[in-house]
A protein has these predicted regions:
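N-terminal secretory targeting modules
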Residues: 1-97, 112, 161-165, 178-181, ...
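Membrane-water interface at transmembrane helix exits
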Residues: 34-38, 42, 122, 425, ...
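Membrane/wall-proximal cationic-aromatic binding patches
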Residues: 41-132, 252-297, 369-371, 389-407
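Extracytoplasmic/secreted envelope proteins and their assembly/folding machinery
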Residues: 118, 122, 152-156, 316-319, ...
């Protein structure tokens, strides 16, 4: 008890341990409330991948959740790590089985599984006379971001066990050629196959890299467990990705602005003028096109240097190797080139403006021509989808890529998957017909 007039006694401060405990309890309570809120609102931002010592990464068996980065679809990975329904590895006698290899277009997490082109293909091929009453299965081995080299490794590691009658490779022309080359892909956490003389040599140096070693560590495994079981980690990851995407968009706008300024400066230096009064699109100099520096768009130009020529040679060798391994097991091998957004943008004027920015020699179907030439040289069956998909989009005035707010960009939407699946089924049905009625091997359709 204090004496009258004396200063009040100060209460002792809580110890540091107590203060830390209070802060920790407050944080945990806030996270608990946040977790409950996210679960009640059914928020999720799932990750579907895990590291793999052969392929770099694969889909995580059993992973599932809503994918909302592009489009909206509930994605479930089956028990064998495929974005597909459950499949039996042993092939029944009455089944015609197609194994699909590809990247994000084949994985198709942007749409419901039943709307994906491979599901459309499966249904339509079932009506094909060449199926001869057999039940058709199109099994999807596609994984987002895979290079052709990773797809060849997938063929060796995973596809063979399913005993397919046909192996179908879907090529995304605006990045598959470059994804096989480390200097272009700029990724050190995946395997590569490199040309060595007339063959391919593995480059598995990614296994010794810090990034892959961390992903396979106990700490990373614990992190994946937390991510699989706690929704608030999804919210933090989404915020991180949104922040990175906005930074990338700002950088892209800055690069485009700088390229346009260089183009205008070059035009002034050459005695050029501003845009013609009639509104016609000015024709830039070859090195001044704003899109020329975009790696994905360089595929529409003739290979400009040894790096690009080497990338095309490697792609050809990978396809030949894949065909040889498939046919050695008694199956047939088909290649299909899909479509890039600008190729099927339903506005000829927009496509023409894009080509003008790229400069002289640009050809929207240049990649298809080069793949067709590969087919003719090597006896590969190549289906070129983009030209007919462009005609389809123009005739119907429909976007095959993108969703409201970003129509014409990104991956195939439901319209694109449906059109591609139906077109591919038609082309494959013709090729699967008895040999007397089929087009000769090594052609393109």
């Amino acid at each position: 008890m204090t004496k009258p007039g004396s200063p009040p006694e100060r209460k002792p401060k809580p110890s540091l341990r107590v203060r830390v405990a209070v802060v920790a309890a407050s944080v945990l309570f806030a996270l608990l409330v946040f977790e409950i809120f996210l679960r009640v609102t059914d928020f999720s931002y799932p990750t579907f991948y895990r590291p793999d010592p052969v392929l770099g990464y694969t889909l995580e068996p059993g992973a599932e959740g809503w994918q909302t980065k592009e489009g909206r679809a509930y994605v479930r990975v089956n028990s064998d790590g495929l974005r597909d329904r459950e499949r039996e590895k042993r092939k029944a006698a009455d089944v015609l089985r197609v194994a699909l290899l590809g990247d994000s277009y084949a994985e198709a997490v942007q749409v419901a599984l039943e709307d994906a082109f491979h599901a459309v293909l499966e249904r339509r091929l079932g009506q094909c006379p060449a199926a001869a009453g057999r039940r058709v299965e199109v099994i999807n081995f596609g994984v987002s971001g895979y290079s052709t080299a990773q797809e060849l490794l997938t063929l060796r590691e995973r596809v063979r066990a399913y005993e397919p009658d046909v192996v179908l490779l879907l090529v995304t022309t605006n990045n598959d050629v470059t994804d096989n080359v480390r200097a272009f892909k700029d990724a050190d956490d995946i395997p590569y196959l490199v040309l060595r003389g007339d063959g391919l040599a593995p480059d598995n140096s990614f296994r010794d890299g810090l990034k892959f070693r961390f992903r396979t560590s106990s700490l990373a495994r614990a992190g994946r467990w937390l991510y699989a079981n706690l929704r608030f980690t999804h919210a933090f990851q989404k915020a991180r990705h949104v922040f990175k995407a906005r930074l990338a968009q700002r950088r892209e706008r800055r690069l485009l602005r700088e390229a346009e300024e260089r183009r205008e400066a070059a035009a002034r230096a050459a005695g050029g003028t501003q845009a013609p009064a009639n509104g016609a699109t000015p024709q830039p100099e070859p090195q001044a096109g704003v899109a020329r520096g975009d790696l994905a768009n360089m595929v529409y130009l003739e290979p400009a240097d040894e790096g690009w020529r080497g990338a095309w040679r490697l792609m050809e060798r990978l396809l030949v190797e894949m065909r040889g391994e498939v046919e050695a097991r008694g199956a047939r091998f088909f290649v299909a080139t899909g479509s890039n957004p600008i190729q099927v943008f339903p506005d000829p004027a927009a496509r023409a403006a894009f080509l003008a920015r790229l400069g002289p020699g640009a050809d929207l179907f240049g990649p298809e021509r080069r793949f067709a030439e590969m087919g003719q040289r090597n006896g590969l069956v190549v289906f070129s989808l983009a030209p007919e998909l462009q005609a389809y989009a123009d005739e119907r005035k429909v976007f095959l890529h993108g969703w409201p707010g970003d129509l014409g960009n990104g991956h195939w939407n439901e319209n694109g998957h449906r059109a591609a699946g139906e077109l591919l089924a038609q082309k494959m049905c013709e090729r699967l017909a008895p040999q007397g009625g089929a087009a000769p091997e090594g052609g393109t359709r």
